[in-house]
């Protein structure tokens, strides 16, 4: 059984990447080594799977939700050394490889409707990061999400997601991916991004993580308002003013102007006074 009778399903968010140059950029960004074990999310018809296996990796484990694609993938790759396949929802399926080991790296053409939950599963949250972290994740996502992940303070795309992800991983853009690179073409622009999760020694300490998360939720709920308004109530006004000065910002600023490290500094100051 092949893929000739299978059409992309909207409910699964299926848009198959066919552009050779983008596929190659993903492989290059993953910086693959012969000892790597790679988790592939959403192999589809196997265009990227084929290139991963050609790299001579230790193992490639793919997770595919669509039952109708699974048999075609097995037929195509079952004889390939190191290949394994799990049919299921990546938000619920075990992420360990067939030998029980954890993958070194992740590559994924993410269905855009599960980007947030999948990022949390693969990278974690500030107060509960994935540990041990993957060495590297190369992800194809909606351009709008990519811009929010890698945005710098002061940029219109800078958000609570920007702060969270940048406190969990180093993030950079690999390449833009226009709709014509897919079949069928999506209605939005896409982008390949690379995430390199931070080691435990560089992550926010657990006692600060919950405080940072609380501050982000409160401040970015009204991102256009000044911090003197959005942070009102987290501390007595004069103390809050002193904490802001110590952390290096003004309460006249807006939340999208503060760097991730500044949020950590504010959380640390608040924790000292509790």
Curated annotation (Swiss-Prot):
It catalyses: adenosine(1518)/adenosine(1519) in 16S rRNA + 4 S-adenosyl-L-methionine = N(6)-dimethyladenosine(1518)/N(6)-dimethyladenosine(1519) in 16S rRNA + 4 S-adenosyl-L-homocysteine + 4 H(+). It is an enzyme of class 2 (transferase). GO terms for cellular component: cytosol. InterPro entries: KsgA/Erm, rRNA_Ade_diMease-like_C, rRNA_Ade_Mease_Trfase_CS, rRNA_Ade_methylase_Trfase_N, rRNA_adenine_dimethylase, SAM-dependent_MTases_sf. Gene3D superfamilies: Ribosomal RNA adenine dimethylase-like, domain 2, Vaccinia Virus protein VP39. It comes from the Bacteria. Keywords: Cytoplasm, Methyltransferase, RNA-binding, rRNA processing, S-adenosyl-L-methionine, Transferase. GO terms for molecular function: 16S rRNA (adenine(1518)-N(6)/adenine(1519)-N(6))-dimethyltransferase activity; RNA binding. The keyword Transferase applies. S-adenosyl-L-methionine binds at residues 15, 17, 42, 64, 89, 109. Its main location: cytoplasm. Disulfide bonds: none annotated. It is found in: Cytoplasm. Signal peptide: none annotated. Pfam families: RrnaAD. Its EC number is 2.1.1.182. Belongs to the class I-like SAM-binding methyltransferase superfamily. rRNA adenine N(6)-methyltransferase family. RsmA subfamily. PANTHER family: DIMETHYLADENOSINE TRANSFERASE, DIMETHYLADENOSINE TRANSFERASE-RELATED. Specifically dimethylates two adjacent adenosines (A1518 and A1519) in the loop of a conserved hairpin near the 3'-end of 16S rRNA in the 30S particle. May play a critical role in biogenesis of 30S subunits. This is Ribosomal RNA small subunit methyltransferase A. The lineage of its organism: Bacteria, Bacillati, Cyanobacteriota, Cyanophyceae, Synechococcales. The gene is rsmA.
